[in-house]
């Protein structure tokens, strides 16, 4: 069984939360080096807090969480509170995190990790706008050749967009960052809306999480119930697409 050294770059988001929990529940497959927060679904102040809330929910206070870029490279931040609620994790109430935020900036952590590990041994799982990753590539171009691969949720090929008729949210928020990453030469696995709109939740699956009777199971059920209302209203689907967990899977 392959064991992957991973940095998760994220803007939590209920579906980001499920993705992070999946990674934390897979220690035999994933060696999680750290979680880097970026502004996206909600502002950075909330995404870095949400990342720590998720780790504490899983009982993983040992995970290092880093705060990154608070706005896109060249434009104003667009957020998605209309989907994720004002906190980004609306749907259930969880306590303010007690675990510390790391002092080093997320961009510097990405650079440090890539320069101080054997080349092409680190996978970056990108769940949000690509601002942190592109900023690392710009700040120290040496790291580009050291990335094993990037698996990212973003874009839409034949599927309609989820922020404009043509655009997917993560790419739309920072297209300049996306251009840097897509033109970098790093091996990319892109998971667009064409894929994630086929990975839908269902009442049966949501209730299976709730039936676990654990804090994680309850939170996942409540988050999913909140999150799926947007897609039910917009697309008429029977459940919500689990965009970001597809990256970890």
Predicted feature locations:
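N-terminal acidic, glycine/proline-rich low-complexity segments
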Residues: 1-249
